[in-house]
From Swiss-Prot:
A single GO cellular-component term on record: bacterial nucleoid
Protein name per its UniProtKB record: DNA repair protein RecO
Residues spanning the signal sequence: none
Species per Swiss-Prot/TrEMBL record: Albidiferax ferrireducens (strain ATCC BAA-621 / DSM 15236 / T118) (Rhodoferax ferrireducens)
UniProt function note: Involved in DNA repair and RecF pathway recombination.
Annotated HAMAP family: RecO
Amino acid sequence: MATQRISDEPAYVLHRHDWSESSLILEVFTRHHGRIALVAKGVKRPSSSFRPILLPLQLLHVAFGGDAEIRILKAAEWQGGHVMPTGDALMSGLYLNELLLTLLARDDPHTRLFDVYTQVVQVIASGHGEVLQSALRAFELLLLREIGLLPLLDAQTMTLLALDPESRYSLVPEGGLRQTNDADRASLSGAQWVALQQSLVDSAPFTATLRACSEVMTQLKPQLRALLNYHCGVQTLRTRQMMIDLQSLSL
């Protein structure tokens, strides 16, 4: 059987680790092939043309070949656009990468999610800190919806009853969306949940969901954190714990 070769494929490096003295294994998120593993041979040599560009949060066009689970990187070209983020922006990007590594199966294409990820990376690189948190929440919602882990947000999950605009509801990992009391500070009104659901199916879902998230940031964040930790099988994601540790050191 002929070896398949893919060329000019939009991609981001999610993670990299040593494979040999001169080579790396890359976990890459591609637009048309989903998350894949590539071996970058000789990339650690000073003369390698790949060495300065195989970085996270940078849009690449790659070529690769092979029929095994781990393919071989043949070419990579940086597409430009922005410099490497630093500080909180960099940690936010690495957090997104950890979510993709944990929740996406290999060789499962998600073209819409790739496009959303590209938009979030642009927000991260822009240095607009005031919208960064809303962008992260929007990506979390769109990721969960894309992979089938987010219940409908315009109905109670267990009963499928429509939400009352004035009542309060919480999103819980094992029960979905359910009614709660007014004293629950992490809850949202029915009208707010419906607005989030409508944003997810908008023709421009990232922009619409970012806008909707900005209105409910304080209440939404802990609910999404609990849901993501549940599906990732951890109490705290590694990058989130690193951010907590760094913040404590700066106090």
